[in-house]
Amino acid sequence: MLSALVNRVSDKVQVTVGVAQNVAAGENSGGAVDVTQTAGDATQTATDVTQTATEVVAEYVKMTGAGRARLVPVSYVDELLATLVAGGATVVEPLAGVPVEVCDIKGRAAAGELLVADVRTIGAEFSPACRLGAELAVAEDARVPGYVVVCMRKCCIPWVAEAVEAKACPAEDVTISATGAEEQASARVSRHAASDAAQVVAAYLACHPRVEAVRYPGLKTDPSFACATSQLVGGFGPYVDYMWKESPGEWHRFTATDEDARTQIINFERLG
């Protein structure tokens, strides 16, 4: 049964991977071609020990489609977010909820919402949030431990920019971690591998005889598919939510890792 089901997912996986590749190639309304980072790029970054904090910040400006970015001490982040929320902002994540959904950053921003995109969990390389319309994107990077990278949209609302600047430190004063480049590169490679594995697991569950429903943004049948293909870059994240036929209305979550997808499926079946 397991081997047959694993073999049956191949067509679905090809469709999903094809979409991810199209998105990475810039074939989406977000136009995010220049923010895609491959595993090779990440590995190269790991060897670049001469990077400065200023260069790290510039990297995030490019990835998120921002106009500028600042480093804010972690100890000030909650206070900064509280100030922004008090001023009418809404903090969102590109992937949220159970079952998982893609936040329509582009649509909500166009409708007039002031959005702060927290991309620390999914990784900034997956979401050009500022280009999509978020006023700010909050990211983290192992090369600058103790800080978050706060990216500001081009033509950022003045009071929002002022709130960020009030908490920010000059990048020139921040020292790069000696091991941070390798850690950050490894984290990015791991996130992409987990996303790839999740695509396989989602397609597998969609064929599973005991599964009633599956939610994964990379499946063509998913309600978030159109939004995902236009607003995410290089993958659809690690979260796969599913519902057993014997437990209608009860969602369960599978969080993929960077382990081989087949191994994860086998372990899932053993536990299930």
Protein language model regions, located:
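Conserved C-terminal alpha-helix-loop-beta "cap" of PLP-dependent enzymes
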Residues: 199, 203-272
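Conserved PLP-enzyme active-site core in the AAT-like
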Residues: 2-21, 32, 52-209, 215, ...
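Long, intrinsically disordered low-complexity tandem-repeat segments
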Residues: 35-53
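Residue-level detector of solvent-exposed, low-hydrophobicity positions
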Residues: 28, 44, 51, 232-234
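Residue-identity detector for glycine
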Residues: 26, 30-31, 40
